[in-house]
């Protein structure tokens, strides 16, 4: 399975979340709302999740092996790092792509 496209939407908010991403797999399947987060060890990609009635966050979609997780994270973070648009106001959304 190949990641055939990555779209990044930078967010203009304070805090650890830097951007949202969508990935396309094999030109056929899209996963939205991956989050690029600034952690204590640098940037990482969090999978889309939903809060349960008990208050626990559960992934909606996620890789089932480490190799695919590394592919997703590498593609998303590479696209994010190559973006050169500075966000000046919360209404501005920028897109980056990866192919």
From Swiss-Prot:
Keyword Transferase recorded: no
InterPro entries from the UniProt entry: SpoVG, SpoVG_sf
Keywords, ordered alphabetically: Cell cycle, Cell division, Septation
Pfam families attached to this UniProt entry: SpoVG
Superkingdom: Bacteria
Any single GO BP term: sporulation resulting in formation of a cellular spore
Family: Belongs to the SpoVG family.
HAMAP family tied to this protein: SpoVG
Role according to the record: Could be involved in septation.
NCBIfam families: PRK13259.1
Name recorded for this polypeptide: Putative septation protein SpoVG
The organism of origin for this protein: Exiguobacterium sp. (strain ATCC BAA-1283 / AT1b)
Gene: spoVG
């Amino acid at each position: 399975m190949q990641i055939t496209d990555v779209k990044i939407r930078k967010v203009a908010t304070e805090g650890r979340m830097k951007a949202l991403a969508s990935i396309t797999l094999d030109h056929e399947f899209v996963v939205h709302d991956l989050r690029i987060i600034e952690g204590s060890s640098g940037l990482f990609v969090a999978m889309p999740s939903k809060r349960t009635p008990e208050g626990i966050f559960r992934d909606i979609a996620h890789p089932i092996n480490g190799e695919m997780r590394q592919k997703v994270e590498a593609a998303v973070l590479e696209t994010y790092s190559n973006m050169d648009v500075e966000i000046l106001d919360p209404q501005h959304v920028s897109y980056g792509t990866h192919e």
